[in-house]
Each structure stands twice: as structure tokens, then as C-alpha cells.
């Protein structure tokens, strides 16, 4: 089995359905004998260019270990799901379990927003 990193761009109006979509894809992977090493929800982010007249998309990153049959099934599911704007699958040499640089950026942004909210609340008193 090979290691893969999958990046999904989901339609921003479908952000509420992302957990259900993710569970369906996880089920496909584990049913085929694959393993999930890392799942990251990067949230709604600005796109570099417009896709289907949309400026934002919901990003997901999944690192898995699976065989070719499972990957073909996943690619087929991505292709025929209208909520998936784009998908990218990259073969990796080894499993990656640590936080990605993008996830670290997302966590930093969330921490900055939280500290700004605390600062604003403290200054109102």
C-alpha cells in the first residue's frame, strides 16, 4: 500500500456537510483496508483565483495509506460529488502524522483572533 495526501476544496455553501462527507470518505478508505494517518480541516479560505464564480472554498487535508483500488474509488467519488470543487492527490514516501504547515497557520490565526477578542473585552471594562 502507498501513502497519499489528499487536498479537497469543498463548495463554501456545503461547509455544514463537510463532517458527513469526511465520514463517508473515511468509511470508503477503512472498508478497503486502508489507514487514515491525519485529517485536517483548514476551514473556509480565500482561493487564489475564481473557481465556478466562487472566491472562497472549504479546505480539507487527509493523509492515508491505501491501495490502488481504494484510490480509484475515492477519485470516482470526488469526481461525481458536485460539492467537491477540486481535489489533489499526491503520493508520499511515508506517512505524515504531525500538523502540516498550513494547519499551524490556521491555529496561529485562531489564537490571534482569540487574543484580540480578549484584549477588546478587557479594554471595554
Curated annotation (Swiss-Prot):
UniProt-recorded Gene Ontology molecular function terms: small ribosomal subunit rRNA binding; structural constituent of ribosome
Positions of the UniProt region annotated as Disordered: 96-125
Pfam families associated with the record: Ribosomal_S6
Family the UniProt entry places it in: Belongs to the bacterial ribosomal protein bS6 family.
HAMAP family in alphabetical order: Ribosomal_bS6
Stated name of the protein: Small ribosomal subunit protein bS6
Family annotation (InterPro entries): Ribosomal_bS6 (IPR000529), Ribosomal_bS6_CS (IPR020815), Ribosomal_bS6_sf (IPR035980), Ribosomal_S6_plastid/chlpt (IPR020814), Transl_elong_EF1B/ribsomal_bS6 (IPR014717)
Keywords: Ribonucleoprotein, Ribosomal protein, RNA-binding, rRNA-binding
GO CC aspect terms: cytosolic small ribosomal subunit
GO biological process: translation
Compositionally biased region (Basic and acidic residues): 105-115
Organism: Paracidovorax citrulli (strain AAC00-1)
Reported function: Binds together with bS18 to 16S ribosomal RNA.
Amino acid at each position: 500500500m502507498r501513502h497519499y495526501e489528499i487536498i479537497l476544496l469543498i463548495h463554501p455553501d456545503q461547509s455544514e456537510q463537510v463532517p458527513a462527507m469526511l465520514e463517508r470518505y473515511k468509511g470508503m478508505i477503512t472498508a478497503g483496508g486502508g489507514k487514515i494517518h491525519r485529517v485536517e480541516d483548514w476551514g473556509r479560505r480565500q482561493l487564489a483565483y475564481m473557481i465556478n464564480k466562487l472566491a472562497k472554498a472549504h479546505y480539507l487535508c487527509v493523509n492515508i495509506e491505501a491501495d490502488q483500488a481504494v484510490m480509484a474509488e475515492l477519485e470516482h467519488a470526488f469526481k461525481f460529488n458536485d460539492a467537491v470543487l477540486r481535489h489533489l492527490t499526491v503520493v508520499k514516501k511515508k506517512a505524515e502524522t504531525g500538523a502540516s504547515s498550513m494547519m499551524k497557520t490556521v491555529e496561529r490565526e485562531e489564537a490571534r483572533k482569540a487574543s484580540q477578542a480578549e484584549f477588546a473585552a478587557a479594554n471595554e471594562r
